[in-house]
Amino acid sequence: MKQLFGKFACLMLLVMACCVVAPVSAMAGTGVDNFKITSGIDTRKSSEITFDATRVISGTAEKGAKIGITVYEPYTVNGKTYYKLIRTYNITVGSTGIFSQSISLKEGANYLVVAARKDGKYSEIRTTINRKDKVLKSVLSQSIA
């Protein structure tokens, strides 16, 4: 049992070490009123890990605000990080002040920017969601069982 726990602990440390750390940040000051992510991104964390191919991001903002959710793939060349555009999702907030959008995640690092715009005001939240492959999920579930 101790040996199994030791293997599981080592595997979990490896998973955490593989995470790309990109802090969740929010632009404040002249921001869009009531802009807040309510689910799909944990704004208290700098990055998250998932095995899921999709994620639903929901939040609030003032009526008429334009929400853009952009997914980038980070990559490094000669020590400098660049971001390749993967996909952009656009939503207009309705009278309820609530928005929700399902997004696709590729395996590996997915750098997300969720931005709100209205009447010259701008707010954004940035984070990284790391999607792990099914092989790792299988190994973890076998270690736990």
Region locations from a protein language model:
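Ser/Thr-rich low-complexity repeats and stalk/linker segments
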Residues: 2-10, 26-145
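C-terminal segment of classical bacterial N-terminal signal peptides
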Residues: 18-25
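Hydrophobic helical h-region of N-terminal Sec-dependent signal peptides
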Residues: 9-18
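Classical N-terminal targeting signals for secretion and organelle import
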Residues: 1-3, 15-16
